[in-house]
């Protein structure tokens, strides 16, 4: 008999790890996926011991074309039913646009964009059969504004695409029992910034603008379980998103440029 599972990408650190912990705390069986197999193995054992749920993992690099197939085939072979899909994996390129190689950009777009499409496409058919499924798109506050000056040109626009893709899933499948939630964190304290070479910039962000990954993850999971279309973490971030939507684009661009000393996750 098949058992239901929640699949989380980018699950070995930061928001992804805390989402896995929160779902496990709520009693969901977990499938972890990320690149670091040693971390996956350790976290899987911890979750099973702490929360008395079933947890398994598959190591995959979403920058590789074959990764979504590898993940889906693993779930099929193990007879897992994925009724919760958390598209969380991501990173940023700490270079200006003209300094970034095309191969590097292609890998970036595959992790943050193409793999989300592929995984969602692969798991939706089984959700449709059961008329039940929840999908989380971990986007960013950066999706509401142009990228900050000096921080590249792809991260914010790709996250804007993620939002629109999540909206499209809702439009096409909500009436059939499948919901998609766009989760938009602001400055969140995780390994994201050090891994992307941005820790110095993150250190300059005022403390009142930062959130911890556990708080963000709990709010994100709660929003997904309620079937919300979009969830922005924190009152300040909600205000920033509102301002970005109502002010003229020229003003928003100037405001975004002033954030060169910081970075959205």
Regions found by a protein language model. Give the residues of each.
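Conserved glycine-rich cofactor-binding loop
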Residues: 12-14
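Conserved glycine-rich Rossmann-like NAD(P)H-binding loop of the short-chain dehydrogenase/reductase
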Residues: 26-43
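C-terminal helical subdomain
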Residues: 182, 203-239
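Residue(s) in the substrate-gating loop at a strand-loop-helix junction
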Residues: 140
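Active-site helix of classical SDR
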Residues: 120, 158
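Substrate-binding pocket helix/loop in short-chain dehydrogenase/reductase
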Residues: 96-98, 104-109
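Conserved NAD(P)H cofactor-binding loop of Rossmann-fold oxidoreductase domains
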Residues: 88-93
